[in-house]
A protein has these predicted regions:
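Well-ordered alpha-helical segments embedded in enzymatic catalytic cores
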Residues: 33-36, 112-115, 213
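Short coil/turn segments at beta-strand junctions that form active-site/ligand-binding loops
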Residues: 1, 47, 122-125, 221
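Catalytic-core segments of class I nucleotidyltransferases/pyrophosphorylases
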Residues: 124-127, 134-135, 139-147, 158-162, ...
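Conserved beta-loop-beta/alpha segment of the NTase-like Rossmann-fold superfamily
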Residues: 59-170
């Protein structure tokens, strides 16, 4: 099953890191967040990806062109027109196929998905997620849930951590508990979607996929939510970037479900 990764946004709230590269190329533990997402899907035997590029697309293209030459020794035979051999073949992602598609600098999310329709056959089911969110969601259980209902779309729904402290008080307004972080009670769409080919019928030119396309699918009663109570964290701010790197450096990254 192919997976679309939306990787074309500007990342304007993380200008410290995204001035010269797109947000999916911002590194966590020395690896782009895009790599972490690929590793998660690969853990569940998902091997085909379509990366929808836009802002600073050259950075993504160059990363994949150079992928096999990163982090390993290279042997170059200068007598044979610079014949190149990689001394240590990477074990990670070595059987993965990635299509890099330029979907425009200012395209909305729905438009980016619409532009890669050509890479799918009629009737094909596929997945989609965002290039800046990490989770330990069980991809196989997500697929199984999608196949269990008659809708054409499933998104993963989670209760995110509040950015504010959460307090509880008694009848006299005495504070009885104070948590630095609490969870918002309403669930949100965190990506990690499974979509049927018919969803393309709902995408109009330059649609916002979340605010327009999915609303139309939901109004036709064809959209379902897969509840996820585990870890999810977007990288929307510099503070979140620092926190994700701190978790990785301490070997406490909840999204790292694969083995080294």
């Amino acid at each position: 099953m192919k997976t679309i990764i939306l990787a074309g946004g500007l990342g304007s709230r993380m200008r410290e890191e995204t001035e010269y590269k797109p947000k999916p190329m911002v590194e966590i533990g020395g690896k782009p967040i895009l790599w972490h997402i690929l590793m998660n899907y690969n853990f569940y035997k998902q091997k085909e990806f379509i990366v929808c590029m836009g802002y600073k697309k050259e950075s993504i293209i160059q990363y994949f062109l150079d992928f096999n030459s990163l982090d390993q020794d290279i042997s170059i035979n200068l007598n044979k027109e610079n014949e190149i051999n990689f001394v240590d073949t990477k074990k990670e992602l070595n059987d993965v196929k990635v299509i890099l598609s330029d979907t425009g600098l200012e395209s909305n999310t729905g438009e980016r998905i619409r532009q890669v329709k050509k890479h799918f056959s009629k009737g094909e089911t596929f997945m989609m997620t965002y290039g800046d969110g990490l989770s330990d969601v069980n991809i196989q259980e997500l697929i199984n849930f999608h196949e269990s209902h008659e809708g054409i779309g499933t998104f993963t729904a989670t209760k995110p951590e509040s950015r504010f402290g959460v307090i509880e008080t008694d009848e006299n307004n005495l504070v009885t508990s104070f948590d630095e972080k609490g969870r918002i009670e309403n669930r949100i769409n965190c990506g990690f979607m499974v979509l049927d080919y018919d969803v393309f019928d709902y995408i109009e030119e330059n649609d916002n996929f979340e605010q327009q396309t999915l609303k139309k699918v939901a109004s036709d009663k064809k959209l379902y939510a897969f509840n996820h109570d585990g870890y999810f964290q977007p990288m929307d701010t510099y503070r979140e970037y620092k926190n994700l790197n701190s978790l990785w450096d301490k070997n406490k990254a909840p999204w790292k479900i694969w083995n080294d």
